Amino acid sequence: MTVKEASRLTGISIRTLQYYDKLGLLPAMRTESGYRLYDDAALERLQQILLFRELEFPLRDIRTILDNPNFDRRKALRQQIELLTLKKQHLEDLIQLARTLQAAGEHTMQFKEFDTSRIDEYTRRAK
């Protein structure tokens, strides 16, 4: 499958696919003319990359997860779920503040919804 076909299939831009290749995250085979080609194994790897990106994993961590058979995926996923849960709670707090402001039609002096210290602390500890 060409890079253009892979882009259409996945909805990922050609530029992103080229970037993943450059990083060594998604190496492509090359034709004699230098065109990138992806086989089924590469597309499966791309599917995993996209999953981990949706879960907000950094690209360097995704490469480690995919390239190291001894990497503890369960632990990484558990930590990422915890981080996403904290972010979800933060967003829910912001939504509630917006609803409160909308209903009251006036300003309130609340700042706890802007506090990301729990997220920052968890991110620091998880590394």
Give residue spans per PLM region.
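Short, charged amphipathic alpha-helical surface segments
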Residues: 50, 62-124
